């Protein structure tokens, strides 16, 4: 999710209970195709779901049928402004929708890795040297906070 709420908290360094203090520049976005992921999870006998808000909250709703993806507030997911005066609580909640797979996620399902900068992209390229599966690494600066 571009400019996620959690990324903002990491960027600002003000999330109680989170020991990571490295800011947003070292965070990568792992991109996968949802239908392919669901097919893999079903075949592996693993549960998957997507939520309509933050899965860490005590009141989230989840779905496990791709036909229900239309219930995700996609405008909220894409929103650049998700808090503050005049912004609906539905936007902040919807911005935190998540797709989850239990236990594990296989490397071969990744189709892309979004990074903050060219330098970070080069670092990720070095880390993936020698791997048979190479997701596309792309600088996606607009997915990060200014």
Where are these predicted regions, by residue range?
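Active-site-proximal loop/hinge segments that shape catalytic or ion-binding/gating pockets
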Residues: 2-146
